[in-house]
């Protein structure tokens, strides 16, 4: 793929695929057009292992961002001939870690100051697999993969609304944050989806000597920073969560449909996408 100046940062669950059945029904052909025409960067709360499986299935040979902005993964056979400093690597990817290690986050929640809140958390990685399947809608194999966290601690909250607000305030002093992702709360540290978007945007500018236009698409609270920092923002309707309130007056587009059809709908509201696809056809 030749470089063009549009980067599309997209959440996955509830945005690109349905929360209900994890399917892409009705948008597969459109997704393929987007993959061939633009730079689609998945920016999700999902793990490296989950997203890697997804991009392999749909042949998306682009960087992606895992665990709510905690790490950016660059395919070794992708666009870049060089990679950011401080990158680590595995067999298939170079990756830039932006967030805290899971072990560091775990060390904070063992502190006496936070223990009373932790007692109301049901952490994803500690759940019985049947419960993970029930709450995520994933099959057995994918549920096991979702528990293999490197940089975050998703959890179900059993306490009150007042207590979770207090918990959110308490963790800030440790450079941690708690964000809601549609089904689970996520305890993360050191980064978020918006910061990761800016890191990757700036690296594209450095490598290709042009500042790319950024588009962000999401449906939940954990997408808010990404939506705020993008040039164009697409919000996908999600009946299961509160409507995201974005402090932007321009270039915000709201779908009338839920995922996955809402993903196609909101992208086609944006002139740079619509005009480019019409020209290519």
PLM region spans:
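Short, acidic loop-to-helix structural element flanking the phosphoryl-transfer center
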Residues: 20-38, 102, 163-165, 190-203
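Short hydrophobic/aromatic-enriched beta-strand-loop microsegments
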Residues: 61-67, 141-143, 233-238
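Asp-based phosphoryl-transfer active-site loop
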Residues: 4-21, 227
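Conserved acidic, metal-coordinating active-site core of Asp-based
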Residues: 112-215, 221
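Mg2+-dependent phosphoryl-transfer enzymes with acidic/Ser/Thr/Gly-rich catalytic loops
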Residues: 2-4, 24, 184-281
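Active-site phosphate-binding/coordination module
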Residues: 23-123
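Phosphate- and divalent-cation-binding pockets in alpha/beta enzyme and binding domains
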Residues: 26, 50-53, 131, 196, ...
């Amino acid at each position: 793929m030749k470089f063009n100046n549009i980067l599309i940062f997209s959440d996955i669950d509830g945005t690109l695929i349905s929360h209900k059945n994890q399917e892409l029904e009705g948008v597969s052909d459109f997704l393929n057009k987007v993959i061939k025409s633009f730079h689609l960067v998945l920016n999700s709360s999902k793990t490296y292992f989950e997203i890697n499986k997804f991009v392999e299935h749909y042949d998306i040979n682009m960087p992606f961002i895992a665990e709510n902005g905690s790490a950016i993964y660059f395919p070794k056979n992708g666009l870049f001939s060089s990679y950011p400093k401080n990158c680590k690597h595995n067999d298939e990817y170079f990756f830039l870690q932006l967030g805290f290690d899971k072990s560091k986050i775990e060390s904070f929640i063992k502190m006496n100051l936070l223990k009373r809140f932790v007692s109301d958390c049901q952490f994803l990685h500690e759940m019985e697999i049947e419960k993970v399947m029930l709450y995520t809608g994933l099959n057995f194999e994918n549920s096991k993969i979702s528990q293999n966290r490197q940089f975050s601690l998703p959890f179900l909250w059993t306490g009150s609304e007042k207590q979770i607000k207090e918990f959110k305030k308490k963790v800030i002093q440790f450079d941690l944050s708690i964000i809601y992702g549609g089904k689970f709360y996520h305890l993360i540290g050191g980064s978020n989806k918006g910061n990761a978007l800016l890191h990757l945007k700036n690296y594209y500018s450095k490598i290709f000597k042009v500042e790319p236009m950024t588009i962000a698409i999401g449906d939940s609270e954990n997408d808010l920073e990404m939506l705020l920092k993008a040039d164009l923002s697409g919000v996908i309707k999600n009946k299961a969560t509160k409507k995201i309130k974005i402090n932007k007056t321009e270039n915000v587009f709201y779908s009338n449909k839920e995922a996955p059809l809402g993903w196609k709908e909101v992208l086609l509201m944006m002139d740079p996408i619509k005009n480019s696809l019409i020209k290519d056809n």
